[in-house]
């Protein structure tokens, strides 16, 4: 059986993924699927530079801005939704293009995931309340008594992994590492993935990061976050990790000037982009790397891709 093809455009923030994907989709009738963990939320299209906020030319976009920040969501739920969209698109004879920079989503979608059941909202709330009450060290001590294998592999300072391990234990009665050693589930094993990694030269990347944040701050991002502060509690928007949100909140609370908020957000965006480049370089092995150091070189890459796909 000939496997159908999926294109993944990945790379650091502000590297031109959305523009490149939009132009490819426009030329060949492809449909675009989001693979960015923050662009799923409907309340923050500006601060996350959602492409459906930028482009409005009839291209079919999927899994963008469809979820409220108050709704429970997980990587497993994302994988199920994305795989459904991929099969729907290919059944129509179209090629899906997945665009984003969330490495975890890409890695699990392509290479498979450990089939840990979805953690119930009740368990999530209970564990987080417990953590808020007793802190990392006491939670780690509890984990050590119930799951010594996990405790030996998780540092008590690693809050995210610690909470995750305790959630899995409470929900399933099993160690999280029992799932890690099981065979991975590949929900799209009948597809071929063509992974294209955009890797701009560092100086050029930092320039585009700064320019993006400057534009976002001028493009009503302040109003967007102010509305979130008005409509939701701090607990409800605490999990929004998109760079710029924390800085704008600090500005709205009077703790930073607008210029300082922008400068801090730009610095954090550059740091985030650097981490993304490092992750994609080392974690995704089978990929096509596109390197460029000017906008002109980037435009030439687009022309080359259009020609390659046409042939």
UniProtKB/Swiss-Prot annotation:
Which parts of this chain are annotated as the region Interaction with substrate tRNA?
36-39, 160-164
What is the main EC category here? transferase
Q: Name one GO biological process term.
A: tRNA modification
Specify whether Hydrolase is a keyword of the entry.
no
Q: Which cofactor does it need?
A: Mg(2+)
Where does the chain bind ATP? Answer: 11-18
Give binding positions for substrate.
13-18
Give site residues, Interaction with substrate tRNA: 102, 124
Q: Which keywords fit this entry according to its UniProt record?
A: ATP-binding, Magnesium, Nucleotide-binding, Transferase, tRNA processing
Enzyme Commission numbers on file:
2.5.1.75
Which InterPro entries does this UniProt record tie to the protein?
Dimethylallyltransferase, IPT, P-loop_NTPase
Q: Which GO terms describe its molecular function?
A: ATP binding; tRNA dimethylallyltransferase activity
Pfam families for this protein: IPPT
**Record carries keyword Ubl conjugation:** no
Known function: Catalyzes the transfer of a dimethylallyl group onto the adenine at position 37 in tRNAs that read codons beginning with uridine, leading to the formation of N6-(dimethylallyl)adenosine (i(6)A).
Family membership, please give it.
Answer: Belongs to the IPP transferase family.
Protein name from the UniProt record: tRNA dimethylallyltransferase
